[in-house]
């Protein structure tokens, strides 16, 4: 699969960038940066929505949650303080989030829309 991981900065991936990458065979985007698309909106603007409709788009709050999860892990009582335990915990959380999203709809597209739907339901 052709994979793109925008990780350097926020709001830099334009509609033209996405269209050019899709034309070159892009299949998956895993957002490493917070808010990587050049939308005014922080959550699910028009560029992100169009991209989500065309490729497998893993949203930043899943693919970029590693350090946030590490902090949450250390807030728990009596955790193992090893690299392996921390990595396994973050991997398990990310894996569960992806699996929940897939269980809602197994399509290769609209992953971010489904992930936001799940996250918002958990908050309300």
Enumerate the language-model features and the residues they cover:
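Adenosine-phosphate binding glycine-rich loop
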Residues: 22-124
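Activation/maturation switch segments at domain boundaries
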Residues: 11-19, 23-26
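Rossmann-like NAD(P)-binding element
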Residues: 1-15, 31
């Amino acid at each position: 699969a052709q994979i793109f991981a925008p990780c350097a900065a926020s709001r830099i991936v334009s509609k033209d960038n996405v269209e050019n990458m899709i034309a070159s065979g892009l299949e998956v985007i895993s957002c490493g940066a917070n808010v990587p698309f050049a939308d005014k909106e922080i959550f699910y603007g028009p560029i992100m929505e169009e991209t989500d409709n065309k490729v497998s788009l893993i949203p930043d709050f899943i693919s970029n949650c590693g350090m946030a999860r590490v902090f949450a892990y250390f807030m728990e009582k009596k955790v193992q303080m090893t690299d392996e335990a921390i990595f396994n915990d973050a991997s398990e959380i990310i894996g569960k989030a992806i699996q929940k999203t897939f269980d809602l709809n197994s399509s290769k597209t609209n992953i971010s829309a489904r992930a936001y739907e799940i996250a918002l339901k958990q908050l309300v």
